[in-house]
Amino acid sequence: MVYSYTEKKRIRKDFGKRPQVLDIPYLLSIQLDSFTKFIEQDPEGQYGLEAAFRSVFPIQSYNGNSKLEYVSYNLREPEFDVKECQIRGVTYSAPLRVKLRLVVYDKDAPAGTVKDIKEQEVYMGEIPLMTDNGTFVINGTERVIVSQLHRSPGVFFDSDKGKTHSSGKVLYNARVIPYRGSWLDFEFDPKDNLFVRIDRRRKLPATIILRALRKTTEEILDLFFDKVVFEVKDQTLMMELLPERLRGETATFDIESNGKVYVEAGRRITARHIRQLTKDEVNNIEVPVDYIVGKVASHDYVNEDTGEIIIAANQEFSLEDLANLSQAGHKKIEVLFTNDLDHGAYISDTLRADSTVDRLSALVEVYRMMRPGEPPTKEAAESLFESLFFSEDRYDLSTVGRMKFNSSIGRDNGEGAGILDETDIIEVMRKLIDIRNGKGEVDDIDHLGNRRIRSVGEMAENQFRVGLVRVERAVRERLSLGDLDAIMPQDLINAKPISAAVKEFFGSSQLSQFMDQNNPLSEVTHKRRISALGPGGLTRERAGFEVRDVHATHYGRLCPIETPEGPNIGLINSLSAYARCNEYGFLETPYRRVVDNIVTEDVDYLSAIEEGTFVIAQANAVLTEEGTFADELIIARQKGESGLHPREHIQYMDVATNQVVSVAASLIPFLEHDDANRALMGANMQRQAVPTLRADKPLVGTGIERCVAIDSGVTAVAKRGGMVQSVDASRIVIKVNEEELVPGEAGIDIYNLTKYTRSNQNTCINQRPTVLPGEPVTRGDVLADGPSTDLGELALGQNMRIAFMPWNGYNFEDSILVSERVVQEDRFTTIHIQELSCVARDTKLGSEEITADIPNVGEAALSKLDESGIVYIGAEVKGGDILVGKVTPKGETQLTPEEKLLRAIFGEKASDVKDSSLRVPNSVSGTIIDVQVFTRDGVEKDKRALEIEQMQLKEAKKDITEEFQILEGGLLARVRTLLTLAGTSEVKLDAMDRKQWLEITLDDESQQNQLEQLAEQYDELKAEFDKKFETKRRKITQGDDLAPGVLKIVKVYLAVKRRIQPGDKMAGRHGNKGVISKINPVEDMPYDEKGQPVDIVLNPLGVPSRMNIGQILEVHMGLAAKGVGDKLNQMLKEQQELHKFRNFLQKVYDLGETRQEVDIAALSDDEVRTLVKNLRGGLPIATPIFDGAPESSIKELLKLVDLPESGQLKLFDGRTGDAFERPVTVGYMYMLKLNHLVDDKMHARSTGSYSLVTQQPLGGKAQFGGQRFGEMEVWALEAYGAAYTLQEMLTVKSDDVNGRTKMYKNIVDGDHRMEPGMPESFNVLLKEIRSLGINIELEDEE
């Protein structure tokens, strides 16, 4: 395997055995691809904005004299970049301009004569843009649009499984679901009549729809039934016979032909009888005359002479009818073929229940059902029915829906119209009847072939279309009313409804969520989340077990492990590592193709439907060298069932062992040894890990840490290879390799790093360079680590030395005992950044002012403010300190303009202003790291704002100048090379000013041309940078667009350092969570024979019942990994030669039969030194899930570094020095500190706010609430008979208003008595009883 320069710095030992056929695809592609599809111009008009415009335009006026056509659209550049939007609190969006054409027809000339055409670009609101990392910045905060899993449009056949009717009879139904439009349901009732519902309204006989489609009774019967023909001969009836139709019937008469009796009367007709009849080619048999009684006529039989109908279609025959028919001379009689087994008379019965006779009555019936109470007219009824399923404006199946519809009813082609036609409706009814007759299966609604993903782009497009449709109505009216000669397209379009619809979707849709930004993994997982909730989806309350359950088709598409615990379980899923969406929105997963028993490297992506019938082997099937299966029988899956299949039958094989699970679950080493419930907790808790001060890579990982860190976008990744030219804390400059240059560019890439920024969860985002000047980098190398990444690998926690043993009850019930050393070394110290803002508004009584001149505040309180009244950067503040001084005018009377003027001149302020400064919240203390001041346009900036502005300008200038100098240097270096080639001496060049080089003329024409080109580039570069600086200057100095009534906003950023302390929640990666019970001095912790104390003591009882054995294996493996580091340190101490290090490392990397090949000999001496330096803390190990290190490899590695193979060490008690009775499992586990910190939860109150109605204290920290003394607590005091304590609890300490104020007063006066009165909640109870009409009066006891 080839390692890049930065990967060589720390090579992770991989224990995986299966070859890697396919790299994990880019993790955020589901978001980025979908949104790109939305905003990129699609010439076909199938997707995105283009599709939305084409579906609404052209808009015709009502009178047909004019129309507005759509030509094209373009998105301009956004005004601010992403970072500026976040700072200013605005949306990162681009203005949408649409070219429209207004065509006016001449009404006097012949139809279609054009009188005038006007084209114009019209502004149609702002479209929020996606950042490179798949998020949106809406009002300054990063949000994610979660993809939705919804029922695919199409037709679904289902049954009630016998639950509806008391008899337990299974009732079948069919439902046609369009992408937009009315739902059409067909259903059977217990009497086997077929009914139709539109939009879940009341049901009508299904034949009404057919009548409305201009079908007569005869045509309807013709569509659904086969015929049986009888011939009348004298006194007998001959019946045409198809033997197959007799199966399962009981003969009511002897079935004979040519004197041979085939079936005797009363016998059941079997398959043997049918074979005999077929063999003898019996086509006609004689039947008794009464056999026809009760059969149904297939069409009207008319008396030719009189014209009267003898028997109408769908009427049952009687003997009398038969006589009349033979009298009228009808010799052939056709009846419907029905039986109870597999040809039910459902449609025939339904027709009898159907009261309508012709199309009009059917349309009226539909109209009455859809619009009850409105008088139906013929036109209204017709237009309503047409618009339901046959109008492209109101109904659309979509391409997916049509494809699913056609495949459901058995058509071959996947194309067709977006609307229904009569054949579609008839086919659906036919298929439903077939299913009722026992042919065909009902659909499985939870199959992933019937559920599709709706991603950002599609949802945004739908929302945009909603806005356009609102505009369409207004445009129509304006076109019909306005003066068309004077009107321009601009005057017709009002962009407000469009931007309102888009804004509403991005700002407040259920699927637009505040991004979970705890750490890189939580970001990635949030963007890959698939929710079944949301508009058009399920609701928590209605979703049953089946929807939430893991389905066989989830394999490789949705993760069976990662889903929230609680009410949303199974409704919110995560995309599996390799899954992707196909063009129809169905999830696909990759498989290796098997051709002629050989497993090839070719990969096919299959959707759940395509996968259906294939036999698919698992990724861990054993293969020979040639790529054939080693075993005769292979464990494989077919139609969702696992079983043993002969190797010749296998058609596909899984791509990777982790293709079943999501990214978060793939990060858990030894996942295969954990119980699923705990794995679920482990996967979910990794997302809550807080980035620590110094990230520490996991010693035991799974090998995909690098992939997650890079794809998450928190690291700076090289776009092109080259040489690192300069590095400082905030920027990295790379000189690009010659071969990767675009002709005519300077060849310098500049990466600006993010420093100490606040995340959505108030954690700290900070990037640190990992490269040094002069180092070579290749494309895709990590240049700077972000939060929770270490040398480009995801690092959510810290490797801690752990012992599994009880310790004086301090690890009872999952508590965790931690050594003081962990606190001293700041292993779990985290930085949290809070944003506090102060807003100065314009009030009725005058404007608020930000100032250091605050009434009745001492000097000490103002010591940290500057003259503008804003705290200075670097100040250490604690709860209650003033951050921004602000005064608000308080006035009992509103001032007259004259008084206002006098006040303005003489500045009498102090008397009538109150202090409304921004103070630090009570429980917070920290350091001010940044201040931002936003001033409204037209309001004078204060001194601090100007200082900040100057500083920003200076920084921007420095940035742009440096960037220019670097690029200029690169360009001039090329000029110098050119000049020296042309023979100019270097001494002469050095004597000149560098810019004069461009003015030199050369003899050689081609060289002169090159020089001129470079000179031109130089001028362009200079002009570009001047323009860049001017733009930046304008952005910095212009006023800010603030909300109405806001004059000034000051944002103060406060950094808080949180050390680990008792009450904080910690967890491993295997769902083993606990709360810190005590920080123990190092000297009291258990230590081993070398005197090395452990960092954390965990309870061994937390393992067996939870069945997450992965943590034990991780601890053993961690011990071995650390052992390698210790061994290297020992060798360094002994100052051994380099070749011994090489040999030892080679031995380590060669251990076990793995796919990884590391050739230490190929590394240079410096590279080996760097590698050893980075491995001193321990050898990082990858054990991929389901393909991890076996027990033997762990033992082998432990043996190699001279540690006991049991993984257990002899420990001594730190307090007494005595050895513990038996060896203890000691090793290294990767521990996370979760974002459930005791500082955020602890809260105290003596008095505070009360609820309005009950007058009881509120609950919770956010409301500054008290503790609730609930029902059970009252019982406890009752049980003890503590009457006075109870009385105090229920009155003066809770909701006895007078009692509690009196008590407060008494305490102030030093009098410690209390007089309980009437609790307010009792008054509330009285009021509630009175509201029920029962009067209650309280009697005073005299």
Swiss-Prot record:
Transcription as UniProt keyword: yes
Catalytic activity: RNA(n) + a ribonucleoside 5'-triphosphate = RNA(n+1) + diphosphate
Cellular component GO terms held in the UniProt record: DNA-directed RNA polymerase complex
Keywords: DNA-directed RNA polymerase, Nucleotidyltransferase, Transcription, Transferase
Keyword Calcium: no
Example GO biological process: DNA-templated transcription
Record-linked InterPro entries: DNA-dir_RNA_pol_bsu_ext_1_sf, DNA-dir_RNA_pol_bsu_external_1, DNA-dir_RNA_pol_su2, DNA-dir_RNAP_su2_dom, DNA-dir_RNAP_su2_hyb_sf, RNA_pol_bsu_bac, RNA_pol_bsu_CS, RNA_pol_bsu_protrusion
EC number annotated for this UniProt entry: 2.7.7.6
Top-level enzyme category: transferase
GO MF annotation list: DNA binding; DNA-directed RNA polymerase activity; ribonucleoside binding
Subunit structure of this chain's protein: The RNAP catalytic core consists of 2 alpha, 1 beta, 1 beta' and 1 omega subunit. When a sigma factor is associated with the core the holoenzyme is formed, which can initiate transcription.
Function: DNA-dependent RNA polymerase catalyzes the transcription of DNA into RNA using the four ribonucleoside triphosphates as substrates.
Similarity section: Belongs to the RNA polymerase beta chain family.
Name of the protein in its database record: DNA-directed RNA polymerase subunit beta
Biological classification of the source: Bacteria, Pseudomonadati, Pseudomonadota, Gammaproteobacteria, Vibrionales
Gene responsible for this protein: rpoB
